Amino acid sequence: MTSRERVRAAFEHRQPDKVPVDFGGMCCSMINAIVLKDLRAYYGLEYRPPKINDMSTMTAFVEPDLADCLGCDVQQLYNYGDTYGHINTDWKEWKYRGETVLIPSNAVVKDDGKGGYFVYPEGDDTLPPSGHMPANGFYFDNLTRTPEFDEDEANPDDNVEDYTHVTDEQIAYHKKVLAKVSGSQRAIQVGPGYFGLGDANNIPGPNLKNPRGIRSIQEWYMAPLLYPEYVEEVFEKGTEIAIESFRKYWDAFGSDIDILFICGTDFGTQRGPFMSPEVFRDLYMPYYKKMNDWVHAHTTWKTLKHCCGGIFPILPYMIEGGFDGINPVQCSAEGMDPKTLKDTYGKDIVFWGGGVDTQQVLPFGRPEEVRRQVLERLEIFSKDGGYVFNTIHNIQANTPIENIVAMIDAVKEFNGDK
């Protein structure tokens, strides 16, 4: 099988010849920039300063030569813009924890006077910063820049501003990226923009110059109970924008794309869902179903959702809402036992992730512990297809290279490639 055939088989719940593998194939399966640099050195690849895909996570593009070494079966059409409204077309050097990396040329980074850094929406430093990396930190945290929400002046269009209206420039960018990677035979995944129905990463409006509306994460998660009509109008209009964006991408790319990343909104914590299954079913699921139903009726694409945490109680409604795949499969969270997940929902949804614990085992375990957990997870999740191997979310800063290599070698061992 080609990589593309392998991934399609997994999404059709057929047993592929090997377990498909993803590193850098979607926005939440990335690799920290410094770790990526060290991985390239380990495999003897040409030195290139890591090119930052998104400054909030400080993850870097996985280029084709490294993807070959890692055995990747998925190719991401990397985002046109990042969390802070930086455009990923032109680049400049910046020092990140002593290492040279490439960041978008319109990014403006300023010292905070305490060893950390600020970034600004669309690189406009005449405005308050929208992101902050603390001293000795590795990531930029989004900053809330708006006053407390005034319900007397509530206008749902203020939060609808977050949703991505696809532009001709964005489509042209992705066509250029696709032309460079189309010969790889990897499955192609794309996320055309933000359609997240309240993704905490986007609620503060880090890419917007003058965000309005409900911008405090705490206020947002109370809003469904306090201002249900406001939230429903935001979701209704956001869903219409999403479907129009999907239509534009189908017209531009058709079946050259295999997987559509719809949404990165988290609904789980380490200890379980942070809302009741009934709230998810009644408020969120109808809009997700509308998006997924359009995709399945009008395209050949499979759909993918990211959702961290212990989400076992709401997985039935994600399935009913039409998602084909779920990432990152956080098996370290409460209620997310791998075997129970596979036995209960393995025929209904593709598990994309869950391959190794990135909170404890991968960063702090011994290589043999990493190998053992990877082989155990592969044995459980790979049965009858329906699985794409990946770590649980991005590979974090300071993860030992020997542990990452142990993980990759274990996957190759399981697949008969080593």
List PLM regions with ranges:
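Short, surface-exposed beta-strand/loop "edge" segments at domain boundaries and coil↔beta transitions
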Residues: 28-30, 86, 124-131, 197-198
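Beta-hairpin (beta-strand-turn-beta-strand) motif
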Residues: 72, 79-82, 122-124
